């Protein structure tokens, strides 16, 4: 991303999207897309999603023995009961270490252009490998994960079923593929906003419609559009003015750590806003605890806008329409330890 590109983007953000008089549903349909399960197949690459992989991935998602301490699982930081995130500003990992950023939601993550706030993982397979190996998170190694899973006959049988053509089905790569397969099922369709996009004008009320109109016309949809209302591209954080050090620490340069380009300093993947009402606290630092504060902060720092309390309330009301049907996942009974299963290390 060049500095000229950022400058051009910033200029766009400082002015609202053109307010088009007319039908709100028509205008919204030009910017947003309802969730449809048929979209999943078009975005998952190099991984055939089968029922056997999904079932194996469900177990692995809840499997604490993927971590060195055998205390932490994917579900520890991505709690499916609380919007696919945990409750703190940043997650607590191995040895009670605190992570540097807020855990992104796993719900609808399959629709994101890439994973993590800085987009360093191209897909959910790559993302699944990261926390397992991160010293501040699960602090494990691929070899140790393979040894652990291979030590439990029930897992060996499930890997063989999920990857029948592989000579060595129990592998770190296949662990990640199974987790990805499961996570493709973690979508939240049928939000009231989806019903509105599909033609039901009564699905959202007048205040929520006002919030939607403001969301479009003020420029919020410039970053938060598409099926996930975000997650599709990268944008500088602090266009009109720099957020406070608490919200945007100077030491965290965002995407430039991935691209190695200073042009990407403080550039982050736009947060997807589906189910956002369930996911406080907000931003990559997790330092904003209410949607009202988050909306006002983004209006000021990104769009150079000062919202009235009524405008803020209307936008927050609209954001509440983005909560969809939450996944109904049965908590799995995991395979018992084998005689050679490694012991936990704290």
Predicted region positions:
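Bacterial N-terminal signal peptides
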Residues: 7-17
């Amino acid at each position: 991303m060049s500095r000229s590109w950022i400058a051009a983007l910033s200029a766009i953000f400082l002015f609202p999207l053109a307010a088009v008089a007319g039908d709100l549903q028509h205008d919204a349909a030009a910017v947003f897309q309802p969730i449809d399960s048929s979209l999943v197949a078009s975005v998952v690459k190099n991984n055939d999603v089968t029922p056997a992989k999904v079932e194996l991935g469900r177990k692995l998602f809840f499997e604490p023995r993927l971590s060195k301490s055998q205390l932490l699982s994917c579900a520890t930081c991505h709690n499916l009961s609380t919007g696919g995130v945990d409750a703190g500003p940043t997650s607590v990992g191995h040895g009670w270490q605190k992570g540097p950023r807020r855990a992104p939601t796993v719900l609808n993550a399959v629709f994101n252009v890439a994973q993590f706030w800085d987009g360093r993982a191209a897909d959910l397979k790559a993302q699944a490998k990261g926390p397992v190996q991160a010293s501040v998170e699960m602090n494990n190694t691929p070899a140790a994960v393979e040894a652990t899973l291979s030590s439990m006959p029930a897992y060996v049988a499930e890997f063989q079923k999920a990857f029948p053509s592989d000579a060595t089905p129990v592998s770190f790569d296949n662990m990640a593929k199974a987790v990805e397969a499961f996570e493709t099922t973690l979508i939240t369709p049928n939000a009231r906003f989806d019903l509105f996009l599909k033609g039901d004008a009564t699905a959202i009320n007048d205040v929520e419609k006002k919030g939607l109109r403001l969301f479009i016309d003020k420029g919020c949809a410039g970053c938060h559009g598409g099926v996930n209302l975000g997650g599709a591209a990268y944008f500088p954080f602090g266009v009109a003015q720099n957020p406070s050090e608490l919200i945007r620490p100077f030491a965290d340069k965002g995407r430039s750590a991935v691209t190695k380009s200073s042009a990407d300093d403080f550039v982050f993947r736009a947060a997807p806003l589906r189910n956002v009402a369930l996911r406080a606290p907000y931003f990559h630092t997790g330092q904003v605890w209410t949607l009202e504060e988050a909306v006002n902060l983004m209006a000021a720092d990104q769009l150079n806008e000062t919202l009235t309390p009524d405008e803020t309330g209307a936008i927050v009301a609209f954001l509440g329409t983005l909560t969809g049907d939450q996944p109904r996942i049965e908590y799995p009974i995991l395979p018992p330890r084998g005689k050679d299963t490694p012991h936990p290390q704290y």
